[in-house]
Amino acid sequence: MATRSKSSQRWLKEHFSDPFVKKAQAEGMRSRAAYKLEELLERDRLLKPHMVVVDLGAAPGGWSQQVRRQIGDTGRVLALDILDMPPLAGVEFLHGDFREETVLSQFEAMLGDQPVDLVLSDMAPNKSGVGAVDQPRMMHLAELALDFADNHLKTGGAFLIKLFQGEGFDDYVRDMRRRYDKVSIRKPEASRKRSPEVYALGQGKRAHMK
């Protein structure tokens, strides 16, 4: 118990001294994750006016907030999450599990006949702290996001997803390379150094898989 207490105290100290946490609080952003996305979007110039962007696993809303901030009043930001999320100006939120047909039908009705330019996924499982449990759960969510992009992202579009390095990671990246003209692995500055998370970016979705 003492070890857990020390670990919790260390996490809290690190969290509140984190410059990205302070920046998020100062700028009214919902999470420090917004700055991971900011770096990724700007590095690869992923956003343009009038784009349609889908944010999977959107709660608490930092990524959707960042996208809306960057594209201004143009385009659409559609956010989905199994967790509820307080409203965000300029963001269309659907509360539900996109694996369910009813939720998927609602999403498709929201989307109408507009093509999706960019699919984002910052989804992650609730961590148990046991890698042998967490990694398969993470890869399962990643497969769901990849399947979603297969079915809803336009040809030529881009897909950005958070992954944990570990079992299944290399196979997943290979699967992405079959689907996209260019695949890059990124570790933004706002990612904590000890974290296994990286971001995989697929650009130029192919009409047909290799």
Swiss-Prot record:
Active site: 162 (proton acceptor)
Disordered: annotated span: 187-210
GO molecular function: rRNA (uridine-2'-O-)-methyltransferase activity
Source organism superkingdom: Bacteria
E.C. number(s) listed in UniProt: 2.1.1.166
Binding annotation for S-adenosyl-L-methionine: 61, 63, 81, 97, 122
Pfam families assigned: FtsJ (PF01728)
Gene3D superfamilies: Vaccinia Virus protein VP39
Regions of compositional bias (Basic and acidic residues) in chain numbering: 187-196
Record field: transmembrane: none
NCBIfam families: PRK11188.1
Protein name per the record: Ribosomal RNA large subunit methyltransferase E
Lineage: Bacteria, Pseudomonadati, Pseudomonadota, Gammaproteobacteria, Lysobacterales
